[in-house]
Design a protein with these regions (language model features):
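A short, exposed loop/beta-hairpin motif centered on an aromatic-Gly-Thr core
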Residues: 24-35, 107
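Short, charged, surface-exposed hinge/linker loops at domain edges
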Residues: 2-4, 45-108, 113-121, 127, ...
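Alpha-helical DNA-recognition elements
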Residues: 135
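Short acidic/polar mixed-charge low-complexity motifs
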Residues: 1-3, 14, 24-26
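Short, proline-centered helix/strand-breaking motifs
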Residues: 21-24, 111
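Short, well-ordered alpha-helical segments
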Residues: 30-49
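Short aromatic-glycine-(Arg/Gly/Cys) micro-motifs in beta-strand/loop hairpins
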Residues: 8-22
């Protein structure tokens, strides 16, 4: 699912601060514009990937409704030359698969006889479970 949200890119000494006003002023930063965009994509994907049950995800505002001045005011900050508003887009599920790929430990039960045969044949249980889940969930 690709999502697109407006973000305020504030030019600051040493880089850019990026704020998503629609998402409770979610923020990140970068040393330069390229890094700021990459960090904006990362924080947007992380925020939307597994929201808390109580977390309200506001719909994105039209770009023309997002004000640098109003957003800066929320932080008691100024708008420096070189600041701008732009859309940031990310395919949340794809980004998560490619970048949030940390392993989690799972405890499961299988029949002893099956375990004995698998151990004898040096089966990698984690690999088999991962491959079976990918197939079962029809994930590419």
């Amino acid at each position: 699912m690709t999502v697109t949200y407006p973000a305020c890119f504030f030019k600051e000494e040493g880089g850019y601060a990026v704020v998503f006003p629609d998402l409770n002023f979610l923020a990140t930063q970068g040393k330069n514009l390229d890094e700021a965009f990459k960090m904006a994509v990362d924080v947007l994907a992380a925020y939307l990937y597994r929201p808390a049950a109580s977390q309200v995800i506001n719909p994105p505002s039209p770009l023309e409704r997002v004000s640098l001045k109003e957003t800066a005011k929320a932080f008691k900050s100024e708008v420096n030359p070189g600041s701008f508003v732009n859309y940031v887009s990310v395919d949340v599920e794809k980004y998560a698969r490619e970048n949030f790929n940390c392993s989690v430990k799972k405890t499961l039960s299988i029949p002893m006889w099956l375990n004995d045969i698998a151990v004898e044949k040096n089966v990698n249980f984690s690999k088999v479970l991962k491959e079976a889940l990918i197939e079962k969930l029809n994930i590419q």
